[in-house]
Amino acid sequence: FIDHVEEVTDEFAARRPEVAVPVVLRRLPPGYYSTDLGRSLAQFVQRYGDAVDRRTTLIICGDGRNNFNNPRLDLVEFLRRRARRVVWFNPEGERQWGTGDSDMLQYAPAVDAVHQVSNLRQLTEAVDRLFM
């Protein structure tokens, strides 16, 4: 999620997205959240790292803005070595990478591909590229 991993598979498997999203959000404790991608990556590797193998296509969704926290590139590289491929869907264009608290200039070389995905057309194109 923002600073931690949240399992949402069951909610989305059993409900339409417009119902599942509020269910997931209600489950989260109230408060201020500050993006910490490194912490999220560490939790993901700890909980699910063993499930990532050469059959896995890992898709990371987010803008790569990290509030100047440790980006944990070592964990992205670890996942890339284990997975078939690692792809990043980012709503921001490449010109915004590296501005402010964006770590995308560091993350981009550590993954197999980065696709700008800020609308349905771009999402469709990015998903189509996964199957080429």
Over which residues does each language-model region extend?
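Alpha-helical scaffolding segments of alpha/beta enzyme cores, especially the outer helices
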Residues: R39, Q43, D74-R81
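Von Willebrand factor type A / integrin I
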Residues: E77-M132
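Cofactor-binding loop segments of dinucleotide-utilizing enzymes, especially the Rossmann-like FAD-
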Residues: F1-D3, D63, P91
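Conserved alpha-helical "signature site"
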Residues: N69-R72
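Von Willebrand factor
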Residues: F1-T56, L58, G93, G98-T99
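Acidic, Ser/Thr-rich peripheral helices and adjacent loops at domain boundaries
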Residues: D10-G31, Q106-V114
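DG-centered beta-turn motif at the end of beta-strands
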Residues: T56-N67, D112
